[in-house]
């Protein structure tokens, strides 16, 4: 997937759902744990050197797995390349849990599944499709048949 660098930098400056200084180790062999400012914006996880305003990198949180490793640590890996893991170290177990939950909820697919679930729940209660008023109820992306388990 291609990204426009200026657009990514602009996105990295947007208000974050979560931000903290965490220990981070990249996927390369021999990579060491470094302190990084980590910032979750929509479905991107930006990471910065602690003394710089521009991100060092970004992870698109789609088709990824967030897994607890040791106490106070978690990793992010991607379905296409499960051996390529990014490791994060939190200051507490509570912080680790908060980050893992936020990262799991950040993907487009999670939001789509939630929308479909709540759409169906509202339809059961009211008998009406809540998306109909927006003129998007027939779009394929909002259909249960397009949902993969």
From Swiss-Prot:
Its cellular-component GO annotations read: cytosol; early endosome; recycling endosome; trans-Golgi network
- The domain of life for this entry's organism is Eukaryota
In terms of InterPro entries, this protein maps to: Boi1/Boi2-like (IPR045188), PH-like_dom_sf (IPR011993), PH_domain (IPR001849)
Expression (tissue specificity): Expressed in testis and liver.
What SMART domains is this protein classified in? PH
Q: Which cysteines are joined by disulfide bonds?
A: none
Instruction: Extract the Pfam families matched here.
Output: PH
Question: Which ranges carry the PH domain?
Answer: 15-108
Q: Which GO terms describe its biological process?
A: endosome organization; receptor recycling; retrograde transport, endosome to Golgi
* Name of the protein in its database record: Pleckstrin homology domain-containing family J member 1
């Amino acid at each position: 997937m291609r990204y426009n660098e200026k657009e990514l930098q602009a996105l990295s400056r947007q208000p974050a759902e979560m931000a903290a200084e965490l220990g981070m180790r990249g996927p390369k062999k021999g990579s060491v744990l470094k302190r990084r400012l980590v910032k979750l914006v929509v479905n991107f996880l930006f990471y910065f050197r602690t003394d710089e305003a521009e991100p060092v990198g970004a992870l698109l949180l789609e088709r990824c797995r967030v897994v607890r490793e040791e106490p106070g640590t978690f990793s992010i890996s991607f379905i296409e390349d499960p051996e390529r893991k990014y490791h994060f170290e939190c200051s507490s177990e509570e912080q680790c849990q908060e980050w893992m939950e936020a990262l799991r909820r950040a993907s487009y697919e999670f939001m789509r599944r939630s929308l479909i679930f709540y759409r169906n729940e509202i339809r059961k209660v009211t008998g009406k499709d809540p998306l109909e008023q927006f003129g998007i109820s027939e779009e394929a992306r909002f259909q249960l048949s397009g949902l993969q388990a």
